[in-house]
């Protein structure tokens, strides 16, 4: 089994601003933390993005469909 983590937002899609941080940065930081935590426990996980890039909804769905198997969690 693999866990697919989708931080959403990114690139030109900043999301809400909370204090001095944008939602896209908070989501990426949280997703990286989750991914590292899972991997440190030998739980297979992968991110749909690990840099500040923008994905369309179609690109995101295509990438998830390419990565996932029948028993994966998204």
Regions found by a protein language model. Give the residues of each.
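Catalytic-core regions of hydrolytic enzymes
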Residues: 2-74
